[in-house]
Amino acid sequence: ENKAEKHFSRKSGWLDLSRIRISVQYQKEWAQMFQESWRLQKEFFWTEDLSGVDWERVYQRYARLLPRIGSRSELSDLIWEMQGELGTSHAYEYGGDYPHAPRYPVGCLGADLVFDSKRRSWIFQKIYSGDIWKTNEHSPLAEPGVAVKEGDQLLAVGGVPVDEHKTPGELLVHQAGQFVPLTVIEGNQKKKGAKRKAKEARQIVVKTLFGEQKVRYREWVRNNVKTVESLTEGRVGYLHLPDMSTHGIAEFHRGYLAQVDREGLIVDARYNAGGMVSPLILEKLAHRHLGYDVPRWGSPESYPYHTLRGHLIVIANQFTGSDGDMFTTSFRQLQLGPLVGKRTWGGVIGIDGRYQLVDGTTTTQPQYSIWFHHAGWSVENHGVDPDIEVEDTPQSFIKNEDPLLARTVQEMLRLLKEKPVQSVSYSPSPRRLLPE
């Protein structure tokens, strides 16, 4: 077909759907959506009897509130409350025909800035380098040629001077992902007048970030690695599992392969958002060190390849959930090592999120439950209790302390003292002498 035949007309047969106007009676639409979400749970919940919940009675109880709904958000509240009667995790409702809220994307510099009242300027207190080789996952101030250091001063954003009243943040509103000129001066300069500052200042142009979560996450992980290495004199490794999906499996291999030869490994599963790759990670951790492949040229390699020879400890907290729950309870069942921290979230009935309501809302039906030999059905709605419970208080957060990691290192050092990991000591190589 050529372009002329695609024009909207009776001759072409193409209809311009954008000209169609539809009048929606929201009360009737919301009633239908409520009924549909109820029906989807009835048809797809993982047990036919919905774990004994009188689902017809639940519908009658909440349907009486439909005439009193006055907004789309109130419908969401009603669906959430109804699905909550199942007492089951992963029964969600999200999306739908909501009005678009105004957005004010702030351009991020991947740095902490503080105002210095003596120098009357903003100071780059901390610059988060992140992963310099990943686009949008490092501070733009760490780019080659920018040459901004911690302690340097920020004088202006986009040509507008900053002070205690005009902050960098407000000048970066609507500048996310944009090239923004910054006026900076070296931090080791003594207090000078405005004219002298202006003369010695220089202008740089950086492309701001849309957010700093990944940049700051990398800094947190690196600091934890350094802490563990320092406290154990390099004998113990550390890695973090942010989820059980693509990010999590990538982070696992990034940390695991670099530290697999240590005498111990701390696997931090705090804030693990779940996913589906826990069996792959458990398979790696469960492989035991059986021997070495010893070549003439090169270094000996563990057999099986990339297997641990030392102790394992997992850290978990109340934000470790879903496949994170399954990982921690399986770690215990396999007797790979102790669990340190807090009881996990407790939600292990899986979903696929394939069904949508008429306005695009997605509701999820808990369809895939799991039973463990050692725990039965008990992980759902309870979680996994740690072997060593440690409180993480607000006071610790304010002091920038990590009591869970500190207690884990303490436990690892105890294990290394009581059950030392033997260094490699080969027996003499066999002799193959010719017979006399």
Features from the language model and the residues they span:
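Sequence signature of WD/YWTD-type beta-propeller architectures
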Residues: E1-E93, N224, G383
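C-terminal, active-site-flanking charged/polar segments
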Residues: E1-R19, Q335-P338, R354-Q365, S369-H374, ...
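Hydrophobic alpha-helical and helix-loop surface patches within well-folded domains
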Residues: S9-R10, R57-V58, S71, K126, ...
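Cleft-lining beta-strand/loop regions that shape enzyme active-site pockets
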Residues: Q27, K42-W46, D131-L141, L155, ...
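A residue-level signal for conserved active-site and pocket-lining positions in enzyme catalytic cores
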Residues: S37, M82, L239, G376, ...
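Extended, small/polar residue-biased N-terminal targeting/export presequences
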Residues: P67-I123, A201-V206, F210-N224, V409-E436
